[in-house]
């Protein structure tokens, strides 16, 4: 269910700044706050406990239970479509310490794509302090991303090892739980008690994509 609300009084002011619109999408995350890899909801929190029949609905505002936190949800998709309908030029600003899936910027097949999207800015944590200077032309950024951005995180090799493992699968075993205060059966006292496995070593991000063909062949 989308929570997009239209305001006719606000819409009447659009003509005063019709040259371009900016849409800001925010994500939080960091050490001790891994981004959820599922939008399964038990009515109170994100969960993987399907066996108990708890995760039987998507997070409020999500498109699907199979989506993840770094995708645009239904609210954001509807908002972006609405703004693109009202403005001929739209720039998306990403206020996030984590890279989001941004295929909607240039992929016509993406569910959130629109022809009126003309650009995107990634301002990360403190970038908001200089974003206005970039927008008005006082500062000229490099125009390049600082890493390789995946179009589909579920196809990224680190997907199976990263985060709090709130996705069902063969990897969701006892070995993925760090038992520093385990119960008698070897599990943590909390099902969220997981840890990140960096099996890729230093070959994260662009290092993986730039070296995979050399170390493993083109296939």
Regions found by a protein language model. Give the residues of each.
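C-terminal non-catalytic regions of proteins with extracellular/luminal or membrane-system context
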Residues: 1-219
